[in-house]
């Protein structure tokens, strides 16, 4: 996710890290959405979001050796069985959307109208959605005020690569 520095007030960051740029909060969220990184209750709704579907194991956010946390048995069993059908993924729209035009939890559909997942959050032309992995290479869309809005999903580069057989 980049660098986070604590420096003395007035420090010249381009001297500390040559070629670096200082971003604002919108830059941070765009970068986060491009990488498929969830943050907070909008991306991880309490009582709804599951740790493995939210890629927390990929980010070392789950311990499979520590016990005694709520959902630990289900999480460990699912991880070791290897069947995770949905994951949070970065999505991109063909054009930037008006701010707050997509309701949280809006259903994402395949071209044939079958449910592919749910939109979690986004801004401009980027977002994050919980999608069925079987549908990520298909054309996807959202219905917004009666209009079909097309979007594409992608697998982030930082995800572990599947083992070759």
Which sequence ranges carry the predicted segments?
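Acidic, low-complexity central loop/insert segments
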Residues: 1-38
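Residue-level signal for inorganic ion chemistry
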Residues: 5, 71, 113
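A short secondary-structure junction signal
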Residues: 3, 14-19, 42-47, 73, ...
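Glycine-rich, small/acidic residue-mixed loop/short-helix segments
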Residues: 54-60, 76-165
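A short, contiguous structural element within a folded domain that forms the immediate neighborhood
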Residues: 41-66, 77-78
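Short, low-order "capping/linker" segments at domain edges
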Residues: 35-48, 159-165
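Short, catalytically relevant binding-site loops at active-site mouths
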Residues: 11-12, 37-40, 81-83, 97-98
